[in-house]
Amino acid sequence: MKLTRILTIGACAAIALTGLNSQTAFAAEKEHAEHKEKTVVPESVDGIMDAIHKAHGDLADVVKSKKLADVHHHAFAIRVLANGLPAKVAADKKARVEGSAKNIAKLAEDLDKTGDANDQAATEANLKKLDGVLKALDAQVK
């Protein structure tokens, strides 16, 4: 009888903890999704690139000031903007710009993870990688 009671309590605790983790993950995803909806993609390539550079500057400031909890807002804004570029560039540039947009999306995820983990060194390293990809993107859209 005692063993059954202990197993029942253990199972209930496991279910409760699983529910808490799911709610926490859902809340984090919802927060990231809400920010994505707020990013407005300009109509022109120049407008998108200006917005990317502004968000990149904001991201660099956030990382420099060690406010890593805010990294994902700026990283995901850059991702949304970069994903809007392939449809706006000339056909001969589209494939390369799509490749850069994929790299930016991966780096945005990496920045989010390292920022959420409060890992300053890894976040700075990912920001440096993003700097290089954005430099290449600048050359691709010209």
Across the structure, where does each feature detected by a protein language model lie?
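Short, solvent-exposed, charged loop/turn and helix-capping segments
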Residues: 81-100
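Short, flexible helix-adjacent loops and helix caps
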Residues: 60-68, 87-90, 116-120, 142
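C-terminal segment of classical bacterial N-terminal signal peptides
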Residues: 15-25
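Short, charged, amphipathic alpha-helical segments
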Residues: 71-76, 95-105, 121-132
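Amphipathic, heptad-repeat alpha-helical segments
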Residues: 68-87
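Bacterial Sec-dependent N-terminal signal peptides
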Residues: 1-10
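C-terminal amphipathic alpha-helix
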Residues: 30, 38-46, 58, 107-142
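Immediate post-signal-peptide N-terminus of mature secreted/exported proteins
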Residues: 27-74
